[in-house]
């Protein structure tokens, strides 16, 4: 993970310090001037050494995730603020030269940006990640069987339970309690239960097994659930993937891998189908098989489709099926939102919320957790979907 951007991170650490050293530190006079400059550079040298630890580690992330989390926190604490200040100061210096003013107001703007950076960092790390919100949505369809009018589905995704190990276990218990408090008819987990490997799930089997719904808990596989984020032989990865699936079933969840089940209410029924993860086929596995998942399902059936990656909706689900409602996750809204805007909008057309195409809809959950314990403006989300039968007047 860090290895891929190591050069960029080192440049981000060094270049701002070169600017600050030249523009400010060299002006310091006196016997201790060199000592002060050395002290200023020490954190940067330390971050370069810390970065090199990841460069020589072939893993996507270290087995002890805290090593990565501490590093990323220090990047936000030390490197990003200096980048922001140096950028603002340099722009201000250029403007000062152009308009021939004495004051460099870019320095003031830079200080403000540093304070804002630290606010976002500390809030997202120590407040935002611990928050859970319940989001109510209503989906209406004339095709919904009458017996399912008012049917309640709780959707959650992207648990990344390994991030809760080491002091945050109570947060996952709170998620379970919040889900159960909704008295759902069905619960759908839209993938990414783990970060790297199934050993993260083992401590939480009893907790997650406590999720209750009248018609059960259904789940699908996410890209993190394949153990592709560890350096291991194909056999070890296959064993890990097998254990992840077995642990989900041990929790009482019904894992749907290109398959479906029928839920009945009297003579009426709906289909809950689940696809294997279906990403771009490059960075993310593309294994979804819509036809296999809906094999034997009537064209007149009402289908709720679960698929981790929302890009699959337009790529496969819309053209290859009649599934009326699709439930996805994956994006996390990049764990950063200001108002209704998220940088995820640069990457995903559908990144969070309810989206429609004619009478068909996609609901993308922004998830409850994350590989990195940070959320700003996008608290952990539990989506409560109430399905309503739309009455069509003749």
Region spans (language model):
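Short N-terminal secondary-structure initiator segments
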Residues: 1-10, 98-103, 130-135, 159-172, ...
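Non-catalytic terminal accessory segments
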Residues: 1-130, 392
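Soluble catalytic domains of enzymes that build or remodel membrane lipids, polysaccharides, and related
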Residues: 147-393
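Short, charge-rich amphipathic segments
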Residues: 19-28, 99-116, 138-145, 172-187, ...
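Beta-strand secondary-structure signal
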Residues: 87, 136-138, 384
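Hydrophobic alpha-helical transmembrane segments in integral membrane proteins
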Residues: 117-144, 163-167
């Amino acid at each position: 993970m860090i290895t891929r951007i190591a050069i960029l991170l080192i440049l981000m650490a060094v270049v701002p310090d070169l600017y600050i050293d030249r523009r400010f530190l060299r002006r310091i006079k006196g016997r201790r001037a060199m000592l002060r400059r050395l002290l200023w550079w020490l954190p940067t040298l330390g971050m370069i050494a810390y970065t090199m630890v990841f460069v020589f580690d072939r893993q996507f992330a270290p087995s002890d995730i805290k090593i990565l989390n501490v590093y990323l926190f220090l990047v936000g604490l030390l490197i990003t603020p200096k980048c922001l200040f140096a950028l603002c100061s340099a722009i201000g210096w250029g403007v000062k030269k152009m308009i021939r003013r004495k004051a460099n107001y870019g320095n003031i703007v830079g200080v403000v940006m540093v304070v804002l950076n630290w606010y976002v960092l500390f809030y997202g790390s120590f407040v935002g990640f611990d928050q859970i919100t319940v989001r109510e949505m209503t989906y209406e369809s004339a095709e919904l069987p009458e017996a399912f009018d008012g049917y309640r589905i709780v959707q959650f995704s992207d648990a990344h339970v390994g991030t809760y190990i080491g002091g945050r276990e109570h947060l996952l218990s709170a998620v379970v309690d919040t889900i159960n408090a909704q008295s759902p008819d069905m619960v759908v987990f839209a993938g990414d239960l783990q970060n790297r490997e199934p050993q993260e799930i083992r401590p939480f089997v009893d907790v997650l097994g406590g999720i209750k719904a009248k018609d059960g808990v259904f789940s699908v596989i996410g890209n993190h659930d394949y153990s592709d984020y560890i350096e291991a032989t194909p056999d070890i990865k296959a064993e890990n993937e097998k254990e992840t699936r077995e642990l989900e079933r041990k929790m009482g969840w019904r894992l749907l891998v290109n398959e479906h089940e029928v839920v009945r209410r009297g003579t009426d029924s709906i289909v809950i189908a689940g696809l294997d993860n279906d990403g771009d086929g490059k960075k993310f596995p593309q294994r979804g098989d819509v036809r296999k998942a809906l094999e034997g399902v009537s064209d007149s059936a009402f289908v709720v489709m679960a698929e981790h990656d929302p890009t699959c909706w337009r790529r496969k689900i819309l053209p290859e099926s009649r599934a009326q409602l699709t439930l996805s996750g994956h994006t996390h809204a990049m764990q950063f939102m200001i108002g209704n805007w998220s940088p995820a909008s640069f990457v995903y057309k559908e990144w969070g919320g309810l989206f429609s195409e004619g009478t068909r809809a996609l609901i993308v959950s922004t998830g409850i957790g994350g590989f990195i314990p940070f959320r700003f403006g996008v608290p952990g989300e539990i989506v409560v979907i109430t399905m309503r039968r739309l009455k069509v007047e003749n």
